[in-house]
Amino acid sequence: MEFTPSFEQGTLIKRYKRFLTDIRLEDGSEVTIHCPNTGSMRNCLFEGKKVWFSISDNPKRKYSRTWEQAESDCGDIIGINTGRANQLAEDAIKSGVITELQDYDLLKREVKYGSENSRIDILLTDNDSHNEPKPHCYIEVKSCTLLEDGQGYFPDAVTTRGQKHLRELMEMVSMGHRAVLLFVVQHTGIESVMAAKHIDPDYAELLSQAHQAGVEILAYNTEMSPNQASLLKSCPVKL
C-alpha cells in the first residue's frame, strides 16, 4: 500500500476526547488532528515522539489531518489507523504474501454473516463452476499494536465486539466453512502475538475455544514507513 502523497511529520503533544490529538508541526505550530483509533491505544502514546499524518482535501471535514503512525520510545513504528488493517490484509492475500489464503477465485469485503448480525471483513470463495469448490473462507481482521515486556498482545481493552466475532467464526466452522482470525501486527517491535488474558480474560478463553473448534489463527507483521505499508511475513501466535 503506497501513500500518495507521503505522510507528513509532527510531534505528539497529547490525545484526548478519544478522536482528537494535538501535535506540533515541524514549523513549531500546534494543530489538532483526527485520531482514527477508538481503542485504548495502550502503550502507543509517547508524548514528545514523532507522529505521521495524512491530509484530506475534503472541505467538509472539520479536521483535515488524520493520525496514521507513531514512534515509540524504542524507535519502533506503530500503525495508529486501524482502518488500514483490512486493506493491508486484502493486498497481502492478492499478492500471495499470506500463503495460507491462496487459490480462491473471489474476494469480497464486509459481507453479512452469522446469527449475531455481523459483517465479515473478508470473504474468499470459489466460482460455482468448479467441480469441487472449496468451502467459503471467512476472515476476521484485527489490528495488533500492544507491546508489553517484549510480548505482543490483543486486545488492548475489553472487547465484547471481538468476543462476538469469535463466536461467529466458530459458527461458520460448525457449518462446514473455513474461518480465520488474522492479526495484522501494526507495531514493528512485536515478534509474537498472544491473547491479553490480563486485560480481557473472556476474550482469551473464547480464543482458546475457537482454536480448538477449528478456527485458524494467523498473524502477519507489517513493514511501515511514511511512504508505504505492507504485510511482510508470518508472525508466531502463542495459544
From Swiss-Prot:
Q: Which GO terms describe its molecular function?
A: DNA binding
Q: Which domain of life is it from?
A: Bacteria
Gene3D superfamilies recorded:
2.40.50.580, 3.40.1350.60
| CDD domains in the record | SfsA-like_bacterial
Write out the similarity annotation.
Answer: Belongs to the SfsA family.
This protein is called Sugar fermentation stimulation protein homolog
Q: Which organism is it from?
A: Shewanella woodyi (strain ATCC 51908 / MS32)
What is the organism lineage in this UniProt record?
A: Bacteria, Pseudomonadati, Pseudomonadota, Gammaproteobacteria, Alteromonadales
This protein's gene is called: sfsA
